[in-house]
Design a protein with these regions (language model features):
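Short linear sequence motif anchored by a di-proline
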Residues: 1-217
């Protein structure tokens, strides 16, 4: 385990809504330096044992891209297009909607991001209007990356949603949707430079095996 991974683990608790950990390939030294700076800044405001809950409307770290390359920044999870009219908060963007509707397709093309995770939670319907909270991690990957897109609001602040797709064969008994997970390294490393069509083709259920754990309510 790299020093970067250990440092991240000292800040971010394992059991969080979407568990954020950023570990990039060693050759991407510039990005690792940015991550280290971000962590050091957060350490000024957090105790090592404090839980970092990435829930709706929170600012969380994401990976973005501009002419200077990849970089770490914080964006608010949840897009609200019109706060005055109180339009619904959009925290997930469906893959089929992105593929069919020009507005969402353009956002995904021009404003794409990656959200690093170590796991996520889903709510399984167990009948009688009851749901069971399930913790989901990947069997062979400690860290994985989920595509997302962002919108810049009237104040110039960026808000994002993550991209979801149909459930994999491993998740279908738990929930009818799941985050898109980029299964291979090339999909992650080329995500910001691949064409729109190439990235749309990546929006599909993951083939990675999962480990599940029932959580106490």
């Amino acid at each position: 385990m790299s020093g970067l991974s250990k440092l991240l683990k000292s800040i971010y608790n394992e059991d969080i809504k979407i568990k954020i950990l950023d570990e990039i390939r060693k050759e991407e030294e510039n990005l690792e330096e940015e991550i280290e700076k971000e962590i050091e800044e957060q350490k000024k405001h957090k105790k090592d044992s404090e839980v970092y809950d990435a829930v709706l409307t929170h600012n969380i770290p994401v990976i973005a891209y501009d002419e200077g390359g990849k970089f770490i920044t914080e964006m608010k999870w949840g897009i609200m297009f019109d706060p005055v009219k109180k339009t619904p908060l959009i925290f997930n963007s469906r893959d089929d909607t992105i593929g069919m509707k020009p507005f969402w397709k353009n956002l995904f093309d021009k404003n794409r991001i990656l959200i690093p995770m170590t796991g996520f939670y889903e709510w399984k319907d167990i009948g009688q209007k009851k749901k069971l909270k399930i913790k989901i991690v990947l069997k062979r990957k400690e860290i994985f990356f989920v595509p997302g897109l962002y919108w810049k609001n009237k104040e110039g602040k960026r808000e994002f949603s993550l991209v979801t797709t149909s459930p994999s064969r491993f998740l279908i008994e738990i929930h009818n949707r799941m985050p898109v997970i980029l299964d291979d390294d090339d999909s992650v490393l080329n995500y910001f430079t691949d064409s729109l069509e190439e990235n749309l083709a990546k929006l599909k259920p993951s083939q990675e095996e999962i480990i599940t754990e029932e959580m106490q309510s």
